[in-house]
Regions:
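Short, exposed beta-strand-loop hairpins at the edges of beta-sheets
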Residues: 103-105, 112-126
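Bacterial signal peptide processing site
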Residues: 11-14
Length: 135
């Protein structure tokens, strides 16, 4: 019995260390400069505690989303404004209505997989978000 209690106590300490490491990894992704690709399109991300700006390299389109963090690994993005659209890019859907719920999965020091769902369709998106090597 004493041995079982000892094993349980050791596992609890190990789990807390893992939780603290995960929390630190998630914290590194809340603010910073990142990028991702979808097909031939390349996007740059600038994220603050309250907003995420996404810049489409090919068109110069710059869109800002309001961020709401539900916990360390889940956040929602809601359209805020188009900051720049020099080529008058036509969007395939009404971006002003979009709201995405994103979950960080497979988090490492260099990237994570964003699992996203939005209010415009029933599709689940999986996108690798990569930390820029120079901020």
């Amino acid at each position: 019995l004493l041995f079982c209690i000892f094993l349980f106590a050791c596992n609890q300490v190990d789990n807390k260390q893992v939780d603290n490491q995960n929390q630190e990894q998630f914290q590194e992704w809340k603010v910073g400069n990142f990028h991702y690709s979808e097909g031939s399109f390349k996007y740059l991300i600038h994220r603050t505690t309250d907003y995420q700006e996404e810049f489409l390299l090919q068109d110069g389109l710059l869109v800002r989303f309001k961020l709401n963090w539900e916990n360390d690994s889940v956040y929602t993005m809601k359209f805020d404004s188009i900051l720049s659209n020099p080529n008058q890019t036509q969007l395939a859907f009404d971006i002003t209505q979009i709201q995405k719920k994103c979950t960080m999965t497979k988090v490492t020091a260099h990237s994570y997989i964003e699992r996203s769902e939005n209010n415009l369709n029933d599709l689940v998106g999986l996108t690798r978000i990569i930390k820029n090597t120079r901020d």
